[in-house]
Amino acid sequence: MQALVHDPESPSSLRRAEVPDPVPAPDEALIAVAAASFNFLDLAYADTVHGVGAVPGEDAAGVVVTTAADGSGPPAGTRVASFAMGGALAGRRAVATADLGVVPDGIDLVTAAALPAAGVTALRAVRRLGTVLGRRVLVTGASGGVGRFAVQLAALAGAHVVAHVGSAPRGAGLRELGAAEVVTDLDGVAPVHGVVENVGGPLLTAAVTLLAEGGVALSVGQASGQPSTIDFEAERRHGGHRAVEVFTVDTGYAGFGGDIEELLGLVAAGRLDPQIGWRGSWDRAVEAAEALRARKVAGKAVVEIGTV
C-alpha cells in the first residue's frame, strides 16, 4: 500500500513510499483510510517518536474492510474515525476496535478525521477540570487544534472561557466558538478556576498564578518547546490550595471510541465545529505540514487519502 513515512532527510520529514499492509491483531479492525489529520505531535517530535520508515499520524477516518478476529467492533462497511499512535497516514490502518468511533450519516470522513486526537484531548481535559458551569476557564494556545476544541467544549459546559493567543490575528473567530474573552497577554486577567495549557514555558508559569483557590492547571502540551519553572515555595505561602498537573490523554485509558462518538454526536447536532483550516490531497502533505508548523493553519489540517 501507499503511505507517508518518516524520513528525516525529506521535507518536513515525510516521504511517500510503498509499505506492507498492516496485519491486524485479534482485537483490531482493518480500515481503508479516506482521510487523516496532522497533529502537533506528528511534526514537533517526529524524530523522537517515529523511527525511519514508520508511518506517522494519530487520526484517520475511513471504512472497515476487515472486522476484528475476536468479534469486537463494527462490521465491514461501517464508516469509522480512529485514534491511535501512528499508522494514520496510509491507505490501510489496523486499529483496536476500542479506539474506533462510528461516524453518523451526514458527517463526511474528512470532517471525522479532524476530531480524534485533538478533540478527545480537549474533551478529557475539560472533564478533568470538574464542574465548570459559571466558572472561569483559561485556554492557552487557543487558536490551535486542541485549543479550538477546548474553547468550544468548555463553553458548552457553561464556562466563562478566556482564550489566550499569541497575536490578535490568531484570535479571529474564537468568540464565535464560545470564548467570552480573547487575550494576547495574561496581565490583568481575573482569577480562573481551571487552565487548559497548551503552550508551556513562561506562559504556564504565568497561568498558574491566575488560579483561584481549589483551581487546577493542566499542562496539556508544550508548543513553545520551552521548559516551565514553578515556584513551589511561593505556592506554599499562597496556601497550597491550587494544583498543577501533567495531563495525558490516555490517563485511565479504556478506549477512545466512546469519546470519539460523543464528539461526532456534537458535530452532527451542530454544536461543535471541527475547525478545519487546511484540506487537500495527501500529495500536498508536505505543504500541509509546513503550514501547520509555521502556525499558518487555524485549527486542523486534513489530508484526503483515498475514496472509499
Question: Where are each of the predicted segments found?
Answer:
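Glycine-rich phosphate-binding loop and adjacent beta-alpha segment
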Residues: 202-271, 305-308
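A short acidic, Gly/Pro-enriched loop at the edge of an enzyme's catalytic core
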Residues: 188-195
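Mid-domain Rossmann-like dinucleotide-binding core that forms the NAD(H)/NADP(H) cofactor-binding site
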Residues: 115-185
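C-terminal capping/lid region of NAD(P)-dependent oxidoreductase domains
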Residues: 271-276, 286-308
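Short glycine-centered segments of the SAM/dcSAM-binding site in methyltransferase folds
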Residues: 79, 136, 160, 215-216, ...
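NAD(P)H dinucleotide-binding glycine-rich loop of Rossmann-like/cofactor-binding domains
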Residues: 44, 80-141
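Glycine-rich beta-strand-centered segment in the early N-terminal region that forms part
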Residues: 20-37, 45-87, 198
